[in-house]
């Protein structure tokens, strides 16, 4: 798999990037893949992931292209407003080790989403 480490443990996002797991991909380029989250708490729930396997901390130290694409996807899919968020660790309900950001929108989000 280009960009992902040798398989030590299973990484769903590495599998999606490699097209070995199904996903509703809405955008991709050389560095980033964007797909719809299978969970749907709000109308638009996109996951923006780097092709290269990195941790959340590594991703946020150098947001670069992932940040640019997250904002672009938010503006495209949620023109009335959106949130870009990440979960760090168990208490924040981070379920994937592969660094990623969520783009949430498509409705009034209220104080918390």
Residue ranges and their predicted role:
Residues 1-113:
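HIT superfamily nucleotide-processing domains
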